[in-house]
């Protein structure tokens, strides 16, 4: 399922294909004692089953996992280190993440990052994006991005819960315009804008969800006339554009 700028989200069949691909490769890597494919699997699961933004995934620490704090959720932190929200996850994913820590991050401290680059440093956005793009190509589904996996998570969560406010909380959307973005994603998935969900307190009169976009690197709102789409197809805010030009 794509638009002119690339894939917007995955169909159910495409999601199964991607998850099956990374799981098969990860299981083989575990047998061989290698880590790259296991990291790839963790990345795809955190994007597709938790809906993390790229910067949230890169900043995830071992102390944010259920095995550390005891809640069946991931703690997503803000820029000050405080817990911005708690995203519920399945027991299966919690166990997979715990096994990853036991097998590949043994001895790491709670404040250490969950996922590192292949050189042992912090995992950066472009490295994450390139990994996801490569996985999409190798799984033979074409263009794939962190944003497409996040949108897939949002629409699946809404279809499962039918609770717009809950989806807003889990996805980390705070503004009324962001609520409109969720509505757009969920209604696009249903293929019928006439069936726009109207939950109490979420009236969207006068809000055009197409007036703003979300930076696919940091999650910031991009207003009309700012940001741009880079060569890779990702939409970035002016702040991230300045950062990547310096890098």
Please annotate each region the language model reported.
Residues 1-214:
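Conserved catalytic core of the tyrosine transesterase superfamily
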Residues 184-187, 241-245:
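A short, amphipathic alpha-helical segment
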Residues 200-204, 242, 246-247:
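Structured core of small recognition/catalytic domains
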Residues 216-217, 239:
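Short, cysteine/histidine-rich loop/knuckle motifs that typically chelate Zn2+
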Residues 221-224, 243:
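Cys/His-rich metal-chelating microdomains
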Residues 225-228, 247:
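Short Cys/His-rich "knuckle" micro-motifs
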Residues 230-244:
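Cysteine-rich micro-motifs
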């Amino acid at each position: 399922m794509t638009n002119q700028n690339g894939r917007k989200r995955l169909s159910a069949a495409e999601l199964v294909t991607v998850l099956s691909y990374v799981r098969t490769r990860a299981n083989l890597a575990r047998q061989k004692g290698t880590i790259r494919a296991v990291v790839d699997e963790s990345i795809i699961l955190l994007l597709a089953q938790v809906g993390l933004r790229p910067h949230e995934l890169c900043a995830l620490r071992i102390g944010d996992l259920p095995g550390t704090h005891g809640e069946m959720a991931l703690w997503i932190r803000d820029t000050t280190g405080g817990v911005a929200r708690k995203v519920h996850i399945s027991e299966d994913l919690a166990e997979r993440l715990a096994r990853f820590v036991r097998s590949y991050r043994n001895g790491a401290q709670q404040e250490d990052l969950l996922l590192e680059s292949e050189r042992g440093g912090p995992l950066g956005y472009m490295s994450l994006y390139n990994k996801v793009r490569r996985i999409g190509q190798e799984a033979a589904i074409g263009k794939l991005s962190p944003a497409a996996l996040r949108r897939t998570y949002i629409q699946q969560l809404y279809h499962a819960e039918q609770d717009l406010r809950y989806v807003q909380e889990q996805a980390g959307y705070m503004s009324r315009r962001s609520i409109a973005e969720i509505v757009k994603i969920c209604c696009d998935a249903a293929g019928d804008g006439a069936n726009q969900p109207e939950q109490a307190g979420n009236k969207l009169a006068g809000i055009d969800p197409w007036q703003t976009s979300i930076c696919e690197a940091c999650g910031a709102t991009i207003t009309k006339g700012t940001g741009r789409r880079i060569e890779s197809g990702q939409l970035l805010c002016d702040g991230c554009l300045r950062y990547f030009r310096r890098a």
